[in-house]
């Protein structure tokens, strides 16, 4: 299912990258422009910047409406017109360099299939390899001997291989992992120029994953199993002497202990281990594979989860000398703790150039209650996304914030160039101001939250109409990077204050908050959201008579729960793709032992469907017809029953909308328009 390449002929002003950097003004006298629905729903104008391994080329994805093209420049001559690579049959999702002269491109398109006699509407993705001009296209493993039967071969036609290692020191090969519904995963050494593939590891039916070193040799394997204590995940390392797989760690999923290899780049007999065993948050450790013991703690953050490593060559498994940072889940998502002063100096220099002030941010350890303060930039983060050394050191940088639409910069030598404003038409003054806060739950637990307050110059003084906006998951979390879904920018620019509570059950804020949500769906988890609404009113940030709840996925479940709980806090609710029957949604996953053992004790509590005919407030429900994560029936059942209540119910099915991704910008805009109109005119008839 390869696309027909379409090498674009028309270029826009956005493809000329030598743009002047305009310093931010303390006060802009121009009138504040409220972003339109179409501007909020648009794809980023230009995004996905990356550098070739040798730093000589740079690529990005440019969007014009629903059309997305790959642009490729010579880094030393950005003023020249880039090569433009497009696709006719599928839509480009992402692109990156595999080698100096070859790209990996992911594509997507709607797909209808009959599975088990029923029509399934979904999306399919494809991984393709092409050259820098987009002349030749290959589908990795298309001809590899990976199918066990003709039936399995048909199923595997829908599978999406993934690049496991780019092997930066090999000019031709990468490691690709096959992935299909009808077979286990295998690892292949794939030649990006010839398309030839050779299997390097056949994984067994209980093998979950594998890691390879810089030469492409499998060195670690993750295996699942069941013993007397329950379902476990074991980490195995290949014995250099015997070639056998030796088990080093075993953790039980019901305990939610994490013991995993974060990097193989520490040396031949050393790995970097990530573990939260006996800890509030995960940390990184140096582990001696021969002595089978932890040698030292490499990195820990007292308030955030450590994640992994970064290095110079853009591939994790190179060597210890290339490590430049440890990563952690910070306020803006994945952030870096730099090991070399030069990178921190670059970031501070960029922030000064952009007039980003430093502020003091209080932090609280939810588990212990201990407090501290850190310095951070006000309203945005600056992150180095790529670096290449050489005669002219070259950096790619990203600047982003919840009220600061993402921007991309190139620092080459001493020259700083603005590459792209992802949403150039959005006036960020209309988006208000965001900050990270804590509030107390009724049982005393500290609840982290992100608060976005409308701009008084646009909306006047508070208290404001407010929306409590819980994230999905629930084992997930929010961050303060720009919200490309458009939800928070839409609400804030329409003068609604937004609270994003990191309620109990949220992940990556530490073990205490994560596990406090067990078996508390619609109960203490919901109390946390309600306590956030009460806090907004007590702080005189929100008008207590003008508070609504809006969420998607698990957040949609929370909106259903808000509608049926008799507390009188909310004027109305909006549920996007919400779960209404937790027993039915749980039954879909119960046959998976890992999901069952890990989440069975946690997915218990209120099932809103049981009380849908007694909803207490007006509600709008919307759901995509291609959603294969939360089936459409979850909304249909709730709406059918809720219409028997005395409250107004709106219901909308969005065509070609999955569990989040919209196939066209028109559909994306339709979703945002529904939210805007409901809060302006619905919500019981008079708006919020």
Task: Please place each PLM-identified region on the residue numbering.
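C-terminal substrate/ligand-recognition segments
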Residues: 397-398, 402, 441-447, 525, ...
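Active-site-proximal cap/loop segments of hydrolase catalytic domains
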Residues: 500-688
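Glycine-rich His-Gly loop
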Residues: 328, 400, 469-473, 553, ...
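Bacterial N-terminal signal peptides that target proteins for export
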Residues: 2-14
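An N-terminal hydrophobic leader/cap segment in hydrolases
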Residues: 402-437
